[in-house]
């Protein structure tokens, strides 16, 4: 009968449904853990690097506003099939940030506005001859450009060489403009060496100077710089830089615009916003964005170690260039006018760390040897010189 037939088929139908449900469950369960099969040892290495950056940011307080997002981002983008970066036709948010703020160099330039608003060029304008040390301390960039040319193509070599400026935004801008495939490694190297200034610079300085030279006192006589001079300075520097190295106009212009906000006297609230809110926000976005380029396939390779080594060479030779230039000048100066060669080491762009390191070393040799005003002035000149050097590199590579 019809009723008996339905009884016969009902258990079989339920059994098939149960089998189908079981199959769906196991398929779903397998899908949840399928990414484990896609995990590689290189990704695990990147997790370790990300964890190290987070540790340095939190425990050692080394550039926390940058290294913390960079470290977390490095973990984020090295998860199998990570949704944070573009996968196939699906655009990831970090990839979108890169396109919006890095592919057009917008983030580094906005950061330069904040940096410019932080810098007081007054001490440098009191003694403009100190700008020579900023120029001399860029020697390592061009030495490393020559050296890196043996291992990389010239555009990558130029991007790596700019690490020596100890200026993260300039390094990012140059590497991104030249479309270097090593952007992530270059940024990690640049900011790592900036943070390691108190460790890297003192041994180089001691190696190149005698105790007598390190004890040379340089009494500071405060000059008079008018407000008009401070306002005209960023405008004049931008025009001169544009005429000498047109490729540097964006870098120099945004840096000097930030300084003009500081000095004009009518935009104090905007100046404070640029120094605090803008600079911190852009630094945060930079860290996350560049982390998107720190995928295992791009980062875990022998080239990365070579880039770190070349960056260290550039940094050391920049420091040496400034010190040796001061020693050269001393050959032509009378006994009472000798310069303390250590101030030349502050000509790199790591502001204000390098200036403080030099002052601390001076006080360690002689507790009455105050070099801070000179070293900070040279450090400020290094900010301008590193940006000009980056622009010159871009002009040479054009």
Language model: regions and residue ranges:
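N-terminal alpha-helical transmembrane segments of multi-pass membrane transport
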Residues: 23-92
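Hydrophobic transmembrane alpha-helices of secondary-active transporters
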Residues: 53, 76, 101-125, 258-261, ...
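Transmembrane helical segments that form the transport core of multi-pass membrane transport proteins
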Residues: 237-326
């Amino acid at each position: 009968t019809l009723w008996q037939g339905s009884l016969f088929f009902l258990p079989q139908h339920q059994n098939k449904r149960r089998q189908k449900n079981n199959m769906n469950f196991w398929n779903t369960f397998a899908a949840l853990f399928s990414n484990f099969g896609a995990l590689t040892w290189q990704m695990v290495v990147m997790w370790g690097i990300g964890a190290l950056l987070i540790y340095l940011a939190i425990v050692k307080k080394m550039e926390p506003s940058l290294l913390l997002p960079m470290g977390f981002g490095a973990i984020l983008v090295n998860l199998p099939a990570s949704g944070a970066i573009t996968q196939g036709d699906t655009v990831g948010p970090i990839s979108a940030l890169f396109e919006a703020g890095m592919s057009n160099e917008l983030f580094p330039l906005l950061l330069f506005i904040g940096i410019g608003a932080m810098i007081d060029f007054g001490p440098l304008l009191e003694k403009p001859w100190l700008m020579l040390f900023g120029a001399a301390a860029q020697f390592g960039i061009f030495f490393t450009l020559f050296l890196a040319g043996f291992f990389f193509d010239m555009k990558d070599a130029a991007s790596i060489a700019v690490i020596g400026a100890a200026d993260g935004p300039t390094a990012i801008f140059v590497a991104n403009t030249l479309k270097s495939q090593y952007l992530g490694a270059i940024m990690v190297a640049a900011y790592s060496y900036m943070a390691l200034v108190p460790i890297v610079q003192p041994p180089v300085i001691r190696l190149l100077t005698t105790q007598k030279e390190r004890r040379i006192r340089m009494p500071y006589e405060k000059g008079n710089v008018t407000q008009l001079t401070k306002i005209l300075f960023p405008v004049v520097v931008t025009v001169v830089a544009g005429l000498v190295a047109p490729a540097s106009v964006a870098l120099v212009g945004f840096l000097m615009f930030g300084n003009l906000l500081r000095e004009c006297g009518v935009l104090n609230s905007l100046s404070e916003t640029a120094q605090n809110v803008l600079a911190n926000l852009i630094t945060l976005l930079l860290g996350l964005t560049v982390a998107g380029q720190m995928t295992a396939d791009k980062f875990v390779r022998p080239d990365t170690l070579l880039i770190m080594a070349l960056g260290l060479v550039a940094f050391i030779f920049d420091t040496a260039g400034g010190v040796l230039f001061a020693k050269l000048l001393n050959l032509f100066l009378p006994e009472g006018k000798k310069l303390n060669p250590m101030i030349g080491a502050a000509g790199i762009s790591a502001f204000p760390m390098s200036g403080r390191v030099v002052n601390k070393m001076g006080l360690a040799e002689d507790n009455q040897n105050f070099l801070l005003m000179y070293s900070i002035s040279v450090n400020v000149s290094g900010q301008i010189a590193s940006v000009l050097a980056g622009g010159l590199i871009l002009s040479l590579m054009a």
